[in-house]
């Protein structure tokens, strides 16, 4: 029984509810391979001088890391960091301190940026930083970026893979210009499950992109009542016009596709349930 609990027979794709951020678990059956796309994290906004400073804490300790430990997971084989924004990689120190992260995969160019490298200094174990781009030999198919550049939204990783009989496409914070590049190179590209770029912002998910991909489902990772108004009404209208069922972490909490073989089921779980 212990072995079954700590090495589950099923696999899963789990979109964590990390507020206004991204973090996605890709776990194959029996925990054979543990991959994550982003860690989540808080965007830092300037505070008035009269606001007292508070000790920094990482939400991941109570959300995605806690979930991994509940599944008997003490390591991460591949941690993909889509770009350098804090809402995607801000909780990286917590992962490096509490779990053995074997490899960090970043968009080509990000490995040269000193601004984020301080985040890896707290790692308890050695970890490899590997820059990737189109054509890189990694478990997921890299759809973007095409060349080394600063790790901003426009150079975000876009990753694709198959799990439980479905094809998944994860867009990070990639914008519409990046979507156009992908379609130009792959005019027949399709996917079953699309994780929308940039939390459902109108800067991503162009109508032509959605129409070409023909996703069966769309997933949005966004914070409840976030200050950006994500997901944007234009994006939701685009999905509705294309008749794409959509689910968001801000209303459904954690979203999971749990699978065995080529069959699976969708589950949602609000915090506190």
Specify the residue positions occupied by each region the protein language model found.
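Non-globular, low-confidence helical/coil segments that flank catalytic cores
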Residues: 1-273
């Amino acid at each position: 029984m212990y072995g079954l609990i700590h090495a589950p027979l099923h696999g899963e794709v789990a979109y964590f509810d990390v507020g206004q951020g991204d973090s996605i678990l890709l776990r194959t059956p029996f925990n054979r391979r543990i991959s994550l796309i982003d860690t989540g994290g808080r965007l830092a906004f300037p505070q008035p001088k009269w606001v007292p400073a508070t000790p920094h804490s990482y939400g991941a300790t109570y959300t995605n890391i806690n979930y991994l430990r509940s599944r008997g997971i003490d390591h991460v084989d591949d941690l993909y960091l889509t770009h350098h924004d804090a809402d995607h990689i801000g909780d990286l120190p917590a992962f490096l301190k509490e779990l053995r992260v074997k490899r960090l995969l970043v968009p080509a160019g990000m490995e040269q940026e000193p601004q984020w490298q301080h985040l890896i200094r707290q790692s308890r174990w050695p970890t490899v930083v590997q820059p990737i781009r189109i054509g890189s030999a990694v478990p997921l198919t890299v759809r973007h970026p095409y060349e080394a550049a600063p790790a901003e939204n426009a150079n975000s990783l876009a990753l694709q893979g198959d799990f439980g009989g479905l094809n998944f496409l994860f867009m990070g914070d990639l914008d519409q210009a990046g979507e156009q590049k992908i379609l130009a190179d792959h005019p027949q590209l399709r996917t079953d499950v699309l994780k929308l770029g940039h939390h459902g912002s109108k800067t991503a998910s162009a109508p032509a992109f959605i129409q070409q991909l023909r996703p069966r489902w769309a997933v949005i990772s966004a914070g409840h009542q976030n200050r950006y108004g994500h997901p944007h009404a234009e994006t939701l209208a685009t999905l509705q016009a294309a008749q794409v069922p959509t689910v968001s972490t801000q209303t459904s909490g954690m979203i999971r596709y749990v699978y065995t073989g080529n069959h699976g089921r969708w589950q949602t779980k609000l915090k506190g349930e």
